[in-house]
Design a protein with these regions (language model features):
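Non-heme di-metal
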Residues: 1-290
């Protein structure tokens, strides 16, 4: 039985692919509505999106036994690099002095330590949900028509990527059962508790290479490592109401995935403990003499 998801996902993503020349209204640009401060945030997001490159290298390394998922990552990588490119193209046309240098882009390409693939999958699923909301809020903050359109466009891509990751999470549960449930619930509790943390919980803000600590997050390698918190708190105003939307979306999807309703991170954590106990019981039973 062929359970590969890549052929269908490729067709689905291809059918809604946007063209950088034809689908972005470059001729609608209004220079009076773009400040240097705003252009700097566009530059930082362009560099951040470039980090799909080391993430792809990590995915391919840690999923070398999963050709289906690895093939999907080729599409994900293409679209994420396109996000970086369209933001850089915007700057090239309208704020050329802000275009990231090759050195600035290269700075965010470094090796990530190996990590459990199922936990990484869930982490990036949550990351896509968060980025979708960040970009939607950014589109509301900007008044310049072209960049508003760009953020709206790439936010929809992030939502579709999250949907694709969810398909692979369902597949993993079919294949490994409670092992996958435990991994997804563990990261889900962390990501749904984001309001209790000092820093934004997104893959680009997490430490991924112990030997390079503390410069082992994507954000720590940007020209302004503190830009993200300022962008979220002082510029696009990603406040508690928006944070609540992210958490609700994560819990909603996990409720569907696990076929059990979760309204809070605490409820999800109780479920996680149940799954861990089942795994421990199964492991203990398997070690009993026949």
């Amino acid at each position: 039985m062929n359970t590969m998801l890549y052929p269908e996902l490729y067709k689905s993503l291809e059918s809604v692919r946007w063209d950088m020349e034809k689908d972005i209204p470059w001729d609608k640009f209004d220079s009076a509505l773009l400040t240097d401060e705003q252009a700097k945030t566009i530059k930082m997001n362009a560099i951040t999106e470039w980090s799909a490159l080391p993430a792809t290298e990590m995915f391919l390394r840690d999923n070398h036994n999963d050709s289906d998922f690895s093939a999907f990552i080729s599409v994900w990588f293409f679209e994420e690099q396109k996000h970086s490119l369209v933001l850089m193209e915007y700057l090239r046309r309208f704020k050329p002095e802000m275009v990231p240098t090759e050195e600035e882009l290269d700075a965010v390409r470094f090796e990530f330590d190996p990590a459990p693939p199922l936990e990484t999958l869930m982490l990036h699923f949550c990351g896509e949900i968060r980025l979708n909301h960040w970009y939607r809020r950014a589109a509301e903050w900007h008044t310049e028509p072209v960049i508003k359109h760009i953020y709206e466009t790439i936010s929809r891509d992030e939502a579709r990527h999250g949907g694709a990751y969810l398909r692979y999470m369902k597949k993993a549960m079919t294949q490994t059962g409670d092992i996958a449930r435990a991994a997804f619930a563990k990261i889900g509790v962390l990501m749904a508790s984001a309001r209790r943390t000092e820093k934004p919980l997104h893959p680009t803000n997490l430490h991924v290479n112990q030997a390079l600590f503390p410069r082992d997050t994507i954000q720590s390698r940007l020209p302004d490592p503190d830009w993200l918190e300022h962008w979220l708190d002082e510029q696009i105003r990603f406040d508690d109401s928006w944070e609540k939307k992210v958490v609700e979306r994560i819990l909603h999807n996990l409720s569907i995935l696990f076929e059990r309703s979760f309204a809070t991170a605490q409820e999800l954590n109780r479920y996680r403990k149940e799954v861990v106990l089942r795994l421990q019981a199964a492991q203990g039973a398997s070690q009993l003499p026949a």
